[in-house]
Amino acid sequence: MASYTLAELAARVGGAVEGDGSLRLDGISPLEEASASEISFFSNRKYRKAFEASRAGAVVVEPDEQVAAGRTVLRVANAYLAFAKISTLFHPPREAVPEVAPTAVIHPTARVHPSAQVMPLACVGPDAQVGARTILFPGVHVADGARVGEDCVFYHNVVVRERCAVGNRVILQPGCVIGSDGFGFAFDPEGEGKGPRHYKVPQVGNVVIEDDVEVGANTCVDRATLGTTRIGRGAKIDNLVQIAHNVQVGPLSLLVSQVGVAGSTKLGMGVVAGGQAGIVGHLEIGDGVRIGAQSGVMADVEAGETVSGSPAVPHGNWLKAMASLDHLHDMRKELRSLRREVERLRADAGEDEP
């Protein structure tokens, strides 16, 4: 198992040691579980009690964090980012073992780089390409004419359908499907003499996944009706997300679990959509937009805006509306009382109701 001195870790993440820089650490653990030979991190004030009680040999903290005398810490500008980098040192990514398992199925016209690893029961179809050092876990299917770049990891039962293209350093979690048919049907009231039917619109486009993308388990990215559905460089998509045909997801965007994006909508760079947010089709969502969890986005959103609610409105307006909900019952009672009082005054004055 790898071990590092605290000073070595500081050099790797650009931090400053307070305490014993020669302290050797052999792992990283949560504050509550870390031992004297492990490092932990503290970036959320909710966990201050755990931080103060932690037995960790060292803790990653940010520059303004107050610490008790004698506590060994590694101060960094961004504790969570430093945690990620340190964790990667202790748990480096899996490296490909160049081999093709005997039960893997590689079509004679497929091109699999000699340094790639193809595990049992994985399948690479006709004219497909798999790049250097890419790992295909059991059950992966790379279909006809698909292109897979270098240093990718496709976990169990991933499907990349025909003619789709995946860039370099892409991670596809178990069960995700790239290039499933888009949901396109034209209603035919006659049904060619057989009665009304939904006529399937052929989905003949593809999907392009750019470099450094990660797609979560059981997420589906549908192929375009015509043209390309595109996931931009560095985007991260959580589990159980639905990306419809011809959607464009901008670089560095984050889509949290159960988000749904309907057809032909374009998300700009760095868009963040909270869990279960739904975005209807044919919209333009600008760069840097933030969408609250469970929001229903029904209209274009300008760059930099934050929206919440269903239908989604500017976040400040939504907060005001939510704050009013607790008072609606009392307001209703007051309104009824005022109405009765007005009716009484009109009756006393002999006025008819308007």
Swiss-Prot record:
Where does the record place the catalytic residues?
245 (proton acceptor)
Which reaction is this enzyme known to catalyze? a UDP-3-O-[(3R)-3-hydroxyacyl]-alpha-D-glucosamine + a (3R)-hydroxyacyl-[ACP] = a UDP-2-N,3-O-bis[(3R)-3-hydroxyacyl]-alpha-D-glucosamine + holo-[ACP] + H(+)
Q: Name one Pfam family in it.
A: LpxD
Per the record, what is one GO cellular component? membrane
Pathway per its UniProt entry is: Bacterial outer membrane biogenesis; LPS lipid A biosynthesis
Which Gene Ontology terms describe the biological processes this protein takes part in?
lipid A biosynthetic process
Q: Any idea of its EC number?
A: 2.3.1.191
Gene3D superfamilies per record: Hexapeptide repeat proteins, MurE/MurF, N-terminal domain
Recorded GO terms, molecular function? Answer: N-acyltransferase activity
Q: Which InterPro entries match?
A: Hexapep, LpxD, Trimer_LpxA-like_sf, UDP_GlcNAc_AcTrfase_non-rep
Keywords in UniProt for this one? Acyltransferase, Lipid A biosynthesis, Lipid biosynthesis, Lipid metabolism, Repeat, Transferase
Q: Which NCBIfam families match?
A: lipid_A_lpxD (TIGR01853), PRK00892.1 (NF002060)
Family the UniProt entry places it in = Belongs to the transferase hexapeptide repeat family. LpxD subfamily.
How this chain assembles, per its entry, is: Homotrimer.
Function description = Catalyzes the N-acylation of UDP-3-O-acylglucosamine using 3-hydroxyacyl-ACP as the acyl donor. Is involved in the biosynthesis of lipid A, a phosphorylated glycolipid that anchors the lipopolysaccharide to the outer membrane of the cell.
In Swiss-Prot or TrEMBL terms, this protein is called: UDP-3-O-acylglucosamine N-acyltransferase
Query: Which species does the entry assign this protein to?
Result: Anaeromyxobacter dehalogenans (strain 2CP-1 / ATCC BAA-258)
Lineage, top ranks? Bacteria, Pseudomonadati, Myxococcota, Myxococcia, Myxococcales
